[in-house]
């Protein structure tokens, strides 16, 4: 998959800017706060109409602008595509693919990208939400219908949470509680199967990458966990649903007392161990960085296995934090597809990869 060129209008700090990319390695240089990450964010938008930094489209529109537009030519799945995404203050985002109007859900699955940025260290260091988000971002590109399931689950979760919060003042709300609980169990069963299947593939793909990355010193293992009554997260949807219903019944009183949803896919986690110990609790800074980057490189391999072509790989200010040996390891693994690398350095990385250099400064790209 390749981004051939992109034009930005009113996007973040860009009044108007355009860039053409090499099908191989592209090194995007510039000082801090010049818009390097904003450029990657625009490329990521092409995967499904969503940012990796914010849920609110209004934040993507530059200060003082009434709207923003991203226009790009991409090549994916053996065909050329033109994608146009328009954002307007107070309006729904509009998307066109090859001149045909699309929804964000319809855009998903037509182009894929894998991103690694400094915040991805939180996959290892933070709580379960960071790891669920990592899985959800990947699965949404692999399985386009998954995004709609996430949106439905979020809606149900918010409505049930409101019932649990307000039922003391309005007891009649409890009339609908069991129905929302059942719907959450049904959608959770679907989400859990998707996530567990992805976690299994990620475990297989990441282990050898991490072993090579760490020089054979460390062993990375991943395990998916959901609520206690689900014995097999890779079981049938029906089995998982019934197990969730059991958990829900056992925790109904606790939900009413606490005002919190205690059953469902929002309780899931991906356990990450290094040498048999929790990476979150015991990993060093270097081990954390190595593990997080291994997961992202494994994600890229999963996409390749699925689509028989590599997604665009975006490395945002990553290589500067690695020693020379680890830099070489990463650069040796990114062949075969298009890569966008941001850094504040000079063209040394480009010289090592034979890549194209783009410079971002003063709201422009050259």
Regions picked out by a protein language model, each given a short descriptive name:
Residues 1-31, 171-312, 321-325, 329-332, ...:
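Conserved NTPase motor "head" modules and their coupling/switch loops across ABC/AAA+ ATPases, GTPases
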Residues 137, 347-360:
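Short regulatory helix/loop adjacent to the ATP-binding pocket of P-loop NTPases
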Residues 122-123, 129-185:
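Long, charged N-terminal accessory/stalk domains
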Residues 45-130, 136-146, 203-208, 240, ...:
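Nucleotide-state sensing region of NTPase/ATPase domains
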